[in-house]
Amino acid sequence: FSLWDPFRAWNPLMTLIDTDLVNHMINSFLDIYDASGELPIWPLSAGETGTMIGYHSVSVIADAYLKGIRSFDAEKALEAMMISSDKNKKGSDFYVKYGFIPSNIKRESVSCLLEYAYDDWCIARMAQEMGKEDIYKKYIERSQNYINVFDGATRFFRGKRMDGNWESPFNPLAVGRAYTEATAWQYRFFVPHDVNGMIQLFGGKEEFVAALDDIFNTDAEIHGNLVDITGLIGQYVHGNEPSHHIAYLYNYVGEPWKTQKMSRRLLNEMYHPTPEGIIGNEDCGQMSAWYILSSMGLYSVCPGSNEYVLTTPLFEKVVVHLANGRTLTILANDPQKNIYITKVELNGKQIDTNFITYDCLMGGGELRFTLSDKPNKSRGTAEQTAPYSYTRDKVVSIPYVDKDLNLFQGSVVV
């Protein structure tokens, strides 16, 4: 299993078309847990490599469970999820103790923290669904640790040293060190479970939209070389997974037409019906799954939320044979010419939100997109049309004190 890549789109695609496979995968995860004491991260040839970051098995399990795909032992799965989250790997001991990973002690500290925070939200969601409030509270608090590495001055997630100071000098264009196969630009927007909280850290919707525009429009060049960084538009990198959700974030700030325009550009420029027609490598299905979902007019920004964010379909007609035996037909009028959504209807009922739920899709029927060659700047602009986000109120950093740290002269009284 490659869990760092396909949890983003491939696994959410399978929950639509092959729930048996999803159950089989999760039961295999639990077999691995029985044998090794931990859920898989990135196993190869029956051995765990620990190559990538996060513990994204929990995303696959929680996403399935919350969608009603449950042919596995949920109690055992939750136990495995918690144990795996507390295993000491790539700075997770610091993450649990302090709420951040010291960048002067561990490499990839920012990327690890951001992905751990999302994974902890997945555990919290599943625990809440199972009625385990204490577990929910523990992990939902941990899921907010992303706040602790956001620098309001630069508006980037940055490496923080053990003494609490930012890693300096800071170059958001530099490859590596605090980031996994990326720069600070590509991890600038990775809080899929709490986009609204992230927006508030940026200063509000206007500032967040400006930052989204910047990643696609900047002419700044990456400093350093990494083979995984391919398919650039500005500092957006389609050839590697951390960027894959970014184009869809305009749906959270009332400018969905920008998602529609950019997702179409990515579909047209990053995929070609030729040998080596995919930018980057296939990454165990993720690159293709992004294309499939996006060409259907859907994307799973936050697996575990039970929502798919909307964009313009690529084809006039797509027929999806759902796992429950029903059929979903997606229709769009002249999508090669018309790239903007004016109206969305499911079985004749208008959908005014910028997302659609899993249950609605699995009901089957006809999902019709009415399109135009001009952006509709009135649809999907209201706050209530935005997709799921955990935070609805203002957020603050989580403080910590360690008696072993000597940061002050004299004495410290707590």
Q: Where are the predicted features?
A:
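Active-site alpha-helical elements of protease catalytic centers
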Residues: 12
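Active-site core of glycosidic bond-cleaving carbohydrate-active enzymes
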Residues: 2-8, 16, 58, 68-329, ...
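Active-site-surrounding "flap" and adjacent substrate/cofactor-binding loops of secreted or lumenal enzymes
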Residues: 19-44, 220-223
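Beta-rich accessory regions
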Residues: 272, 302-305, 309-411
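Mobile, glycine-rich extracellular loop/lid and propeptide segments
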Residues: 22-27, 32, 47-53, 64, ...
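Short, intrinsically disordered/low-complexity patches at protein termini
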Residues: 35, 46-47, 325, 392
